[in-house]
Amino acid sequence: MTQTPPQAQAQTEPQPRPQPLSWKLVIDSTDPHAQAGFWAQALGYLIEDNSPLVERLLAAGAVPEAITTHAHGRRAWLDLAAARHPDDPYDEVSGTGQGRRLLFQRVPEPKTVKNRLHIDVHSAPGQRDAEADRLVGLGARVLRTVDEQGGSWIVMADPEDNEFCLN
């Protein structure tokens, strides 16, 4: 009788399923607060409110005022802004979303090439064109309409030219 080497045996035994991981999509931006505002309106999300944490750290002298700003009517981080799903949990101390979340971080350069990753926005049935008009009113642009055998969608760009699709 032959024995299976331990390495081969380990490969054939079912592996335990890993614990699901949380994640956020981080998007480079020249104006993170404007982008968070656009995407919050586009998706029906909330702009994260980090002002209690920012104010507390400023009062304690833990951070310089130069890394903060006023945006959306409150104190915020200068180089970061996020939009989060209104039904998802968030940390009450920092205001940071713990669920579906888009985080915009300031970078010095504008977008120069096609996205390698993009967002698909799903409109209500029969409402795609009306939704495209609404998004254009918020600052998006229509780049093209795609009609293929597998489906139809509108390719759009947000105010900083990040492509996304509207189904």
Where are these predicted regions, by residue range?
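Aromatic/hydrophobic pocket-lining residues that form the small-molecule binding cavity
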Residues: 32, 128
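Vicinal oxygen chelate
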Residues: 2-8, 14-20, 24-27, 37, ...
